[in-house]
Amino acid sequence: MGQTALARGSSSTPSSHALYSDLSPPEGLEELLSAPPPDLGAQRHHGWNPKDCSENIDVKEGGLCFERRPVAQSTDGVRGKRGYSRGLHAWEISWPLEQRGTHAVVGVATALAPLQADHYAALLGSNSESWGWDIGRGKLYHQSKGLEAPQYPAGPQGEQLVVPERLLVVLDMEEGTLGYSIGGTYLGPAFRGLKGRTLYPSVSAVWGQCQVRIRYLGERRAEEPQSLLHLSRLCVRHALGDTRLGQISSLPLPPAMKRYLLYK
């Protein structure tokens, strides 16, 4: 796995690598992704919900795929069948680059988030009930109309990540974070402060006849014991705080311990 970022705090606003320098993966993510994937029945159990989508969306293959009908001036969304309030969850979204259009947003939503709008927009993330990453524009949306939306992942001004066909969504309901992973590298937290909610996989789309697939990769619960090494590392990093993590390399510690504390 690549280096990752987890944000701290209680606000469900977008987070930024520039603001949160704690580059660490959610505990258990590597183990989750290394485990055998759920069987086809479980995949469908966690797939798109044909009863919880815009009227312009057709869910296919028992929930593994949906197709948006070519309706003009409409943005259409869909939720997954299962909502998550506990545990660490990951799922793969497959969305061809040529089928994204002007607004292709991937993320999560509560059961109250709207699933259709009579115009083209980043519907997912447009109000307080959803959180999304526009994989075409590289912007994060929550309670947003698109103005001054933060870039994700954070980088030099004007630079934007090209998101390939497949990406992973990583929802950690124990820490209350939502992030994304591409090519085996977790990009860090996009949103934080999500604890206490029930959130469903969701996307919103504008491209006529686009087909978006979902593949649930599994769950890891907090009840599964964390290693003493990992807990010790968290305690040390928490004691130092974000502003002093850069001083780890100057501490009188063995090189191997310094590397471990820095996730190297």
From Swiss-Prot:
UniProt GO cellular component terms: cytosol; SCF ubiquitin ligase complex
Pfam entry (one): SPRY
Region of interest: Disordered: 1-53
Protein source organism: Rattus norvegicus
PROSITE patterns assigned: B302_SPRY (PS50188), SOCS (PS50225)
Location(s), subcellular: Cytoplasm; Cytoplasm, Cytosol
Gene: Spsb2
Domain of life: Eukaryota
Function: Substrate recognition component of a SCF-like ECS (Elongin BC-CUL2/5-SOCS-box protein) E3 ubiquitin-protein ligase complex which mediates the ubiquitination and subsequent proteasomal degradation of target proteins. Negatively regulates nitric oxide (NO) production and limits cellular toxicity in activated macrophages by mediating the ubiquitination and proteasomal degradation of NOS2. Acts as a bridge which links NOS2 with the ECS E3 ubiquitin ligase complex components ELOC and CUL5.
Taxonomic classification: Eukaryota, Metazoa, Chordata, Craniata, Vertebrata
Keywords, ordered alphabetically: Cytoplasm, Ubl conjugation pathway
Family to which the UniProt record says this protein belongs: Belongs to the SPSB family.
CDD domains membership: SOCS_SSB2 (cd03719), SPRY_SOCS1-2-4 (cd12906)
This protein's name: SPRY domain-containing SOCS box protein 2
The protein's annotated pathway: Protein modification; protein ubiquitination
